[in-house]
Swiss-Prot record:
Family: Belongs to the sirtuin family. Class III subfamily.
Species, as recorded: Plasmodium falciparum (isolate 3D7)
Residues engaged in binding Zn(2+): C140, C143, C168, C170
Keywords for the protein's UniProt record, in alphabetical order: Chromosome, Metal-binding, NAD, Nucleus, Telomere, Transferase, Zinc
Pfam families for the chain: SIR2
InterPro entries associated with the record: DHS-like_NAD/FAD-binding_dom (IPR029035), NAD-dep_sirtuin_deacylases (IPR050134), Sirtuin (IPR003000), Sirtuin_cat_small_dom_sf (IPR026591), Sirtuin_class_III (IPR027546), Ssirtuin_cat_dom (IPR026590)
Recorded phenotype for the gene knockout or disruption: Loss of binding to telomers and subtelomeric repeat regions (TAREs) and promoters of var genes.
Remarks, miscellaneous: The reported ADP-ribosyltransferase activity of sirtuins is likely to be some inefficient side reaction of the deacetylase activity and may not be physiologically relevant.
Protein name as annotated: NAD-dependent protein deacylase Sir2A
Amino acid sequence: MGNLMISFLKKDTQSITLEELAKIIKKCKHVVALTGSGTSAESNIPSFRGSSNSIWSKYDPRIYGTIWGFWKYPEKIWEVIRDISSDYEIEINNGHVALSTLESLGYLKSVVTQNVDGLHEASGNTKVISLHGNVFEAVCCTCNKIVKLNKIMLQKTSHFMHQLPPECPCGGIFKPNIILFGEVVSSDLLKEAEEEIAKCDLLLVIGTSSTVSTATNLCHFACKKKKKIVEINISKTYITNKMSDYHVCAKFSELTKVANILKGSSEKNKKIM
């Protein structure tokens, strides 16, 4: 019913430039970013779908990406994670650095992400709500113990990955601490995300098509709370002309321009003072 109601929403989304976005952010005191897979595309992470090189073109999502597949073949999801960690040089990109800069300047207060790659934390953002979990954590299916992982531990040659699925000292098996198809997002995390959005005076929706219900519902929540919404995406999305006030046609990495404008303005103000 909620998505049906959203489909009937109408709003005139205006196209703006990065310079105009900088002016909008400069007037704000509590900015929240909602990010999706588009923010990781420039970090050499393959997309899940939509290309011949996508993850689900190589691995059957019914086996490798669902909770039912995990219970039947628990080693399969670990194979995907191991292969991606070993075969791709994954690093933070300029967009991640830009968000970290916006936080250090006092504008950005939190990041709500659908990504599981941990790149926002790696770039220096201190308050990150990872709705779909974090691939750098493993949770035991028996005792619920959570183990922190790193890039080395996820490599093919690591002790942790030498036998799949990895086993907990209690005898149980580890599952990546991420949301698989068939699982639901934690209600506590959704509540935390809504609380952050309720406090914001600007929501940046970056690199997400907003077709996943989690993102759509959070944007709808912001819309109902009359929050200003700006999309940063290379194309229009599901919420364009429905919920967003502005749309910036840009790659995630191009946010560097916004960060530099605001950083320059901040330094200029310090000199005047």
